[in-house]
Amino acid sequence: MDMIDKQYKYLLLDLDGTITDSMEGITRSVQYALGHFGIDVTDLNSLRPFIGPPLKDSFRDYYGFTDEKAEAALSKYREYFATKGLFENRVYEGMDAFLASQLNKERKLYVATSKPEVFARQILEHFKLDGYFTYIGGSTLDGSRSSKTDVIRYVMDVNGLDDNQAVVMIGDRKHDMVGAGNNGIDAIGVLYGYGDEEELRSAGASYIAASVEDLEAMLT
């Protein structure tokens, strides 16, 4: 566990792989979308790389889809996700207590996710976690705000978070680390999600937490 020598006031948290384990819902939604194009995937674990990055990018990167085809795949993905995949999900053990503890330490909490904001709000409301957050920020359905860099900047701008030294991003994938760096803030990479230490360190993680308990201990 890395030790933190700063007192952050504002915590930005990723959703998938950081607050909730959303693997089943996301991979089943991707499986459904790929099936529309005649691609039969039976091993859901093989679709884990789709968790975290913008989905259109992943359809292009992993299956060679054109922009137009990736857009169509995204529509099919949302068709399944909006009715079923949204709730094929669970909160990481200890996360509820961690969020409560951070509020007790007079920190403010924000969500910064590549997931469409409308879905992020539904998920957090479903699990009764929305009350912990000052603001829940995500991507737009029309793709005008999709990169993690843009989402982090959006959350910071909307909430007037202009003291970069007081803000930290917490996430499990390289996009969280890169997005934080592009916005001039520190990042904590978590290993209980979908990325590994090499991915997070090489992407610029300021600190690494192996578990929710480590995260709690680091943010005293």
Protein language model features and the residues they cover:
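Active-site neighborhood of HAD-like aspartate-dependent phosphohydrolases
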Residues: 2-49, 63
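Conserved Lys-Pro-Asp/Glu-containing loop-to-beta segment of HAD-superfamily phosphomonoesterases
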Residues: 10, 148-177
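Substrate-recognition element of Asp-dependent hydrolases with the DxDx(T/V) motif
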Residues: 30, 98-124
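Helix-loop "lid/cap" segments that line or gate small-molecule binding pockets
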Residues: 33-34, 54-67, 123-126, 155-157
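Conserved H-loop
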Residues: 40, 130-134, 162, 206-209
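Metal-dependent phosphoesterase signature
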Residues: 60-100, 105, 165
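A short, structured active-site edge motif that brings together acidic residues
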Residues: 130-145
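Acidic, Mg2+-coordinating phosphoryl-transfer loop and its flanking beta/alpha structural elements
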Residues: 169-209
